[in-house]
Amino acid sequence: MIFEDIKEFGEEMRLFHSQVNYRLYYSLGCHLVEKEGKKGAEFKVWAPNAKDVQLVGNFNNWDGSKHRMFFNGYHGVWSIFVPDIKEGEVYKYKITSKKNEVFLKADPFAFYSELRPGTASIVKDVTKPYNWEDDKWINKRGEWNPFENPINIYEVHLGSWRRKPESEIKKIDKPDLEKTQQELKDESGFLDYKEICDKLLPYVLEMGYTHIEIMPLSEHPLDGSWGYQSVGYYSMTSRYGDPEGFKYLVNEFHKAGIGVILDWVPGHFCKDAHGLLKFDGTPLYEYPDEWRSENKGWGTANFNLASPEVRSFLISNAVFLFDIYHIDGIRADAVSNIIYLEYGQPEVRGLKNKYGGDEDIEAIEFLKLLNEIVFSKFKNPLMIAEEATAWPLVTKPAYVGGLGFNYKWNMGWMNDMLKYMEMDPIYRQYHHNLVTFSLMYCFSENYILSLSHDEVVHGKKSILDKMFGNYEDKFASLRMFLGYMFGHPGKKLNFMGTEIGQFMEWRFYEELEWKMLKYPKHDSIKRYVKDLNALYKKERSLWEQDITFEGFKWIDHSNYQESIISFVRKSKDEKDFLLFVCNFTPVPHFNYLVGSEYLVDYEEIFNSDRDIYSGTNILNSGIIQPKLQDRNGIPYSIELNIPPLSTIILKPKFKDEKKETETIKKKITITNLNTSK
């Protein structure tokens, strides 16, 4: 063991050990530097309990004796400067534990990694200046109120949205471990970040989404984990190219006015041998107690969120993604698994904290700190929790007892509504509460209504195929359901494929069923979603008061016998509202009365049953005049045709009082002139 005192390194490491170094990516890992006139790379790795650490790679024929690292015992950090190292060199740390076990570990702070099944880190400088052209977007985001603006998210898995045609995929007849990195890329079928961007961005703009949410891009060994079992938190996966490619993608999306959100997994990590597990022979990143470190549900290891160093590692990673890659938001995965000791682990029972509860106190404090730091460093980021329980105040600040996120997925709404839509309409009248219950709590948090990737895998069927009924009914139900979803309070998220009516479940290893668009029903559902997205963006009443009861009012929630609901969505202007009527059965209704708070004309501006959407074209044409007839305790009403399995949207046509006054004045003037003659 070679000792070295790195004095200039001391303050950074003191902050690291105190959980307040949130820019660790500048301190640890590999950085291209110049020392004493020599250009090369400096490597630093935290392995406080190791007996010896050596740097190995192609540059020394993987012979670590040539590059034994120096140990700073006070901070537990090993370091070495190697001249003439350039970008593209592969490396690992050869770590000998105090039990004389030898591990070859990837760099936890590596900015780039080999494509699987390769596991080495690659020297890459992602902190060097990049020609960003998104100042306009970043400045706009700084002034943007996320609660009073449209958020309509398209969730994407980059490896399966589009893939290379079979004709362009090279098949190489030798074992994977014998293939070069280029050969692995050539036969993977993946598009690179630039190719994906150049196809995905025009599509997102065409369809009218406001944001994309990308499933995890941190480096991971197994395609089938979808990125949720990571080993390289600072390394954008090499499946789709290099870090500059991802910067290009973000830059282009921002220039076009589209936000970029990343899925992020702060609770657990992959247990592959080259990763974080027992990094220096001891549980460094995971909990020391097996009952806490083992995540038996996913076969992963839980991060030790009580550790100051692990907190610094993870919070620095979140900051890194905003700082280096200019992302706009993070969706924290599996927050319920983080905040509860026993969540999702039925074989584990009786785990209690020091107060006798099942809350993970240290993990909760970590989440509060994470959000506090991100919000203090970046203007108006989206910090979204995937949290599936009734834990209170998830989207409230830590200073009032909250976790500090600004949005969470509304898992209750999703579960209730998918259960309802899978049900035979004959029986829906007995389960009407599944439609109405969400309005009892939907303003208790800031919600995103999510129909995510999790709902279209593992035998659950696609969103379209979940819909009850025959072929025609499934499409009608999907249109109705999405229309209802866009009327319900909360921002929106849909997983790729829903917008084209994909019948098959999502498969991570092949692209979406784009071929289905040659069939009219699928093409028309795409048009429907595009038009619905455009309406959502245009109408302030659908997003300006999303988190308050001021933006919603029931017209009729009690017609369970016919499974019809009606409600109003309002903007801050009391005369700017939309009236929604949703029919959850295949029975049409004619001359159906719907209550109106105002004695005002209406116009139908959207109807999921239009023939251009492959519907039956039961419409409400022209001006719909009100009646002086009470309905559901509301003084006025309008008479409508309600198509089967439909959502219709109506807008009031208030008279322009200023224009009316001017018209009256003109008439008076003309009358006076005629009289004087």
Give each language-model segment a name.
Residues M1-E42, N72-E155, S160-L184, E195, ...:
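The feature marks proteins involved in alpha-glucan
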Residues V45, Y93, V156, V204, ...:
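Conserved, mostly hydrophobic/aromatic
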Residues W46-V53, E597-V600:
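Short proline/glycine-enriched turn/loop motifs at strand-loop junctions of beta-rich domains
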Residues S65-G73:
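Short, surface-exposed loop motifs enriched in S/T, G, D/E and P with embedded aromatic residues
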Residues E114, P129, W137-E148, H157-E359:
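Substrate-binding/active-site clefts of carbohydrate-active enzymes
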Residues H326-D328, P346-Y509, M516, K537-D609, ...:
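Conserved alpha/beta catalytic core and glycan-binding cleft of carbohydrate-active enzymes
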